Amino acid sequence: KLKRQERREKNVYYAVVDTNILVSAALAKDRLQSVPYAVFQGISKHLFTPIVDENIVEEYCEVMSRSKFRWNASYGQRFVDEILKYAINEPVAPTDFALPDVDDRIFYDVAFAHRDKNAYVVTGNIKHFPNVPFAISARNFLDLINPVQSQIFVNDVSVSYSASTLMSALQALNEDALKNGSAGMSEEEIVAEIKAARAERK
């Protein structure tokens, strides 16, 4: 047992979670099979620490309150608030690193500023981060932080019934999406809605 604990303490992971992972988790048709949903289970089980800054928090809040998703806006805010309880939240210096969408740079900048922690950008759109060696898909990130149990982890029925307030907040969002019919929205629709939120902020 002691050796297991020592191994866990050595495997400390940090990640900047792209907004599309939040939305995809909340809109999962089947949360027991949803990799984005399992990412947040990873936070609640302290398998990794999320990192944000005020720009990322602002985008999280704006996107999670979009009427397109048709869920209770207070549920979206509660979910963001719960993520922040686990997160490192501090300002970082902006960079001029070239990305296909300049608005994705906020995620790059935070991960880059925390490279001393080997921080990753966890995204549902890896093609949006070309030439970024620390950008990683949600599936590959789960394999990294929990390699032995990653398959069980995603399919574990306890994901639905977690007592953590983070997972309770996400479950409330997901159940609202299932009820109102917005669950299962395509990746293209999710990306379009995130872009719309960014355009309105400018």
Predicted segment positions?
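Alpha-helix capping/helix-boundary segments
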Residues: 21-22, 56, 107, 127-128
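Acidic, metal-coordinating catalytic cores used for nucleic-acid/nucleotide bond scission
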Residues: 96-103, 126-128
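PIN-domain endoribonuclease scaffold, especially VapC-family toxins
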Residues: 41-95, 171-176, 180
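Short beta->alpha linker loops
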Residues: 55-56, 102, 124, 189
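Short linear interaction segments
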Residues: 1-2, 167-202
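Short, well-structured N-terminal submotif of metal-dependent ribonuclease cores
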Residues: 1-50
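Acidic, PIN/NYN-like endoribonuclease modules and their adjacent C-terminal/linker elements
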Residues: 1, 116-120, 126-172
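Acidic, metal-associated active-site segment
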Residues: 101-120
